[in-house]
Amino acid sequence: MEISILLMEQIAELFLMILMGYIIVKTGLLKGDDSKVISKIVLYLVIPCVIINAFQVDYTSEKVKELLMVFAASVLLQVILLAAVWGAGKVLKLNEVETTSIYYSNSGNLIVPLVTFILGKEWVLYGCVFMSVQLVFLWTHGKNTISREGKWDWKKIVFNINMISVFAGVVLFFTRIRLPEIVNQTLSSVGSMIGPASMIVTGMLIAEMNLKSIFENVKVYFISFLRLVVIPVISLMILKISGLVNIHSDGKKLLLIVFLAVITPSASTITQMCQVYGNDSKYASAINVMTTLLSIVTMPLMVLLYQTVM
């Protein structure tokens, strides 16, 4: 129950950040289109800082075992959920924004603050493992889907700053190389912008929307149901059947981090990618807002379900 309360408090805090972005545009200080600059800063600067900084921890065999367990759970979920969402998209005739909003969770923006507040800073690394796995899918499948490109540009994927950051973080961890303290502090400071910056962008986009149309759009509620209820339930079933929880003494806590990453609202990165690649960013933002709003109720309930089932 305590974890559920902490979740509600954290999500409420994110909503206040969205409100700030909304007010900035409504008062005329900035325009909605100005959010594109912030989006690029988040995608190409803030997220890489978060990833590299997260891997700056002491190397131990136990740590490696825990990381591999979380990695296995993350890949397992991403692969199975991708197949499930792809099938649902075909049957339900969902467009690119809808399928990516259902599949991609807001782990990039939420998992770090959520894990920090709920479990402690020392557990953030494991959240970043899931985030890194999702990042690979996001910049391959996600980017290809949203941009409607027929082929993957492997050079852009391999040399993408986010992919490079994942590789750099892993290499630094396994080679036991620690960056100078001033560098780590800088990475940590910049990385702390991830939640506020992403939520402010969402608020700025909302300011130019017809909010009435968002709440009257039945399709948005349906997409939110798939993102916040169906995906988490399927994920919980997969984690339970996999038996991964029995591999480690802290298995339940480690898998909770993975589960927390899965049950978050739709990824705000989808909105940012839609802006960059010319898709429907306003619709993506509407789904993000609705799922974030409803997640105040669904996330605590899903955590309670996890604690009961696992």
Language model features with spans:
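Alpha-helical transmembrane segments of multi-pass small-molecule/ion transporters
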Residues: 1-310
